[in-house]
Amino acid sequence: VFSASCNQKILACAHTSERNFSYLCRVMENFVVSARKYRPSTFASVVGQRHITSTLKNAIERGQLAHAYLFCGPRGVGKTTCARIFAKAINCLNPQNGEACNECESCRSFNEGRSLNVHELDAASNNSVDDIRNLIEQVRIIPQQGSYSVFVIDEVHMLSAAAFNAFLKTLEEPPKHAIFILATTEKHKIIPTILSRCQIY
C-alpha cells in the first residue's frame, strides 16, 4: 500500500515529466536534421562540383535548358542537392548570374516547401508503373507560376522495367513546359533509351 506522501511524490514526478515532455515537444518542433540544416541552397555553396554547377548556371543564364538531365555519382556527392538548386533557379523570376534570387515568390514558395512547379519522386519507394503514371498526369498540367514544371526523380535506377517504359514515352515527347532531373548512384541500371535522351553529368 502506498502512503499519502508516496502518492504526492508520484504525482509531482508525473507533473514534472509532463512539463519536460511539453518542453521537449516545443524544442522538437524547431529541430532540423543537420543534413537539412546545412544542405547547400545555392550553386555557390555547393562544394566540389564547380564544373557541374557552372555548366548549369550557364544553361540558366543563356536560356538553353534541356528537357532532361541525369546526375550520376556515389551517395552524398550532392546530386539531389544540385537537382533542387537547379529546379529552384529554373523558375526564379529574377535570376542573378544563373543563381536563384531567393526573394521572388517562386523562390520563397520553393524554400517553404509549397512550390507547385517542382515535383519530387523518390523512386526507391515509389517505383511502380502507377507511380510513374501519376507523375505523367502531373506533367500535363501547365505551371501555375514560372515557365516550367520541374520533375526531380531521385534513385531513378530503382524504377521497375514497366515504369521505365511508361516514362520513356513522356521523355521522348515532353511538353515544352516540362523539365526532368534524374539522379542515380547506378547509371548502368538505367535503360539506354532513357540515357540517350538526357544530358548526363
Regions found by a protein language model. Name each.
Residues 1, 10-11, 27:
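Short hydrophobic transmembrane-like helices used for membrane targeting/insertion
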